[in-house]
Amino acid sequence: MASNMEVFCEILIAILLPPLGVCLKRGCCTVEFLICLVLTILGYIPGIIYALYVIVFQNREGSTELGAPLNSA
């Protein structure tokens, strides 16, 4: 699991240069990177939103916390 500082740095990079943030997280030859690049070219704000989505929400795919019950007895 990434530390809070790592996630903060990834989010900061995603806000400044959205395709770079996705490239560092997923790789440069991925569909996520190409989508982020196109969205950033068409409009800077959609690129930022998509980059944040990739970094924050797709980061938790392998996490067991997301689907775990609150009270496990």
Swiss-Prot record:
Domain of life of the source: Eukaryota
Coiled coil regions, renumbered to chain: none
Compartment(s): Membrane
Lineage of source species: Eukaryota, Viridiplantae, Streptophyta, Embryophyta, Tracheophyta
Keyword line: Membrane, Transmembrane, Transmembrane helix
Organism listed in the record: Arabidopsis thaliana (Mouse-ear cress)
Keyword hit for Acyltransferase: no
Transmembrane segments: 4-24, 37-57
Family per similarity comment: Belongs to the UPF0057 (PMP3) family.
Entry annotated with the keyword Membrane: yes
Listed GO biological process terms: defense response to fungus
Membrane topology, record value: Multi-pass membrane protein
Any matching Pfam family: Pmp3
Protein's name according to its UniProt entry: UPF0057 membrane protein At4g30650
GO cellular component: membrane
